[in-house]
């Protein structure tokens, strides 16, 4: 069995991030990557090199995001530089719903490893409760967290959304 090689294991976009959550990358302080020992006293550091995020190097961008998130530190921090970026909308399901609000998403995305990079795959469905000559679906066994409405007679897994776990 060949080994799976992950070239980029870092995940900035995922299913557990709050939809209003943001993270500042490329600040003047290195990001903690992983512990080098089992005691956790020494750690490896990294810096974000992806394409995601909005540059917040200028005063007016920092002011705008400080007002948007009610976070004074975005405005007054001396840890932000010209290359600093703000990554927002990190929850992949809410990100996909904003891109395609007319589709219903599966609330259980899964990771795939493609060419050394991690990608989230989200199933998207088209639904109707007016499909001719079709009986209503039995929805009694559908999980409440599924994101599907309770009444439909047609469902099709018509779209797969793919989100890069590092870049978004």
Give the role of each language-model region.
Residues 1-167:
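Soluble extracytoplasmic regions of secretory-pathway and membrane proteins
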């Amino acid at each position: 069995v060949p080994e799976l090689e992950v070239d980029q294991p870092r995940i900035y976009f995922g299913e557990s991030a709050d939809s209003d959550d943001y993270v500042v990358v490329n600040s003047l302080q290195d990001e903690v990557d992983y512990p080098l020992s089992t005691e956790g006293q020494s750690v490896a550091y990294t810096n974000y090199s992806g394409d995601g995020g909005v540059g917040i190097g200028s005063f007016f961008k920092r002011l705008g995001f400080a007002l948007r998130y009610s976070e004074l530190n975005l405005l007054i921090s001396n840890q932000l530089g010209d290359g600093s970026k703000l990554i927002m909308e990190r929850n992949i399901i809410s990100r996909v719903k904003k891109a395609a609000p007319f589709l219903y998403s599966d609330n259980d995305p899964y990771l795939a490893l493609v060419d050394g990079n991690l990608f989230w795959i989200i199933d998207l469905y088209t639904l109707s409760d007016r499909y001719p000559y079709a009986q209503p679906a039995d929805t009694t066994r559908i999980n409440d967290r599924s994101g599907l409405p309770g009444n439909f007679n047609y469902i099709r897994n018509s779209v797969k959304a793919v989100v890069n776990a590092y870049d978004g």
